[in-house]
């Protein structure tokens, strides 16, 4: 199985424009994410996917592989889907471009799902939240899964309700690493956006 790591990076973020190029110890943030991704031995290639000339220039200056993509994409997953039309691969892993200290083992954990069960077409991660402040934080995306571990709902609000039978329910945060088999990614990219 050929596995491709993709780091979507856009300059025009509404909350923090230029975030991928913010300087961290003399290097742009995107460089640190790329270095962490390169530590994943399962990756055959790692690319930054961007629509911005400044990010492309920074990638080239720091010897990172970069692919220019459309500026019409609504999500990082759409950007990864475009990369899948330009690069041969069986599995594409979307790594958030604003996580300079992402643990490579977490990326490997997502990839391992596809080796354990060949019927899996899409995967992501969840981690239990134990800090009450993080449970309440709207900056943390929470996820509810079914008994098999399949995601049912994502929210920045507290889900599930934080009290169940008089005791606190377990709450999980979504870890923003997504992996897609090529066929699933092609179908996913054709789906229209919804309000949720």
Where does each model-flagged region fall?
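Conserved core of the sugar-phosphate nucleotidyltransferase
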Residues: 104-194
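Short, high-confidence coil segments that cap the C-terminus of an alpha-helix
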Residues: 43, 89, 117-120
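Short aromatic/basic micro-patch
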Residues: 15, 101, 179
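Hydrophobic/aromatic residues located in beta-strands of well-ordered beta-sheets
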Residues: 5, 46-48, 92, 123, ...
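Short phosphate-binding loop-to-helix
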Residues: 47, 53-112
């Amino acid at each position: 199985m050929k596995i491709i790591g993709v780091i979507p990076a856009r300059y025009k973020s509404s909350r923090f424009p230029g975030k991928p190029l913010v300087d961290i110890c003399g290097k742009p943030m995107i460089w640190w994410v790329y270095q962490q991704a390169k530590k994943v031995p399962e990756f055959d290639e790692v690319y930054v996917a961007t629509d911005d000339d400044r990010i492309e220039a920074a990638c080239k200056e720091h010897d990172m592989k970069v692919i220019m993509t459309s500026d019409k994409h609504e999500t990082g997953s759409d950007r990864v889907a475009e990369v899948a039309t330009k690069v041969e691969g069986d599995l594409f892993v979307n790594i958030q471009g604003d996580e300079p200290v992402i643990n490579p083992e977490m990326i490997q954990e997502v990839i391992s799902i596809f080796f354990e069960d060949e019927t899996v077409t899409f995967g992501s991660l969840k981690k239990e939240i134990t800090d009450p402040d993080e449970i309440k934080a709207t900056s943390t995306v929470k996820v509810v899964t079914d008994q098999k571990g399949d995601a049912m709902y994502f929210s920045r609000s507290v889900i599930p309700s934080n009290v169940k039978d008089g005791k606190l329910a377990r709450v999980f945060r979504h870890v923003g690493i997504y992996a897609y088999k090529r066929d699933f990614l092609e179908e996913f990219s054709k789906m229209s956006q919804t309000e949720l």
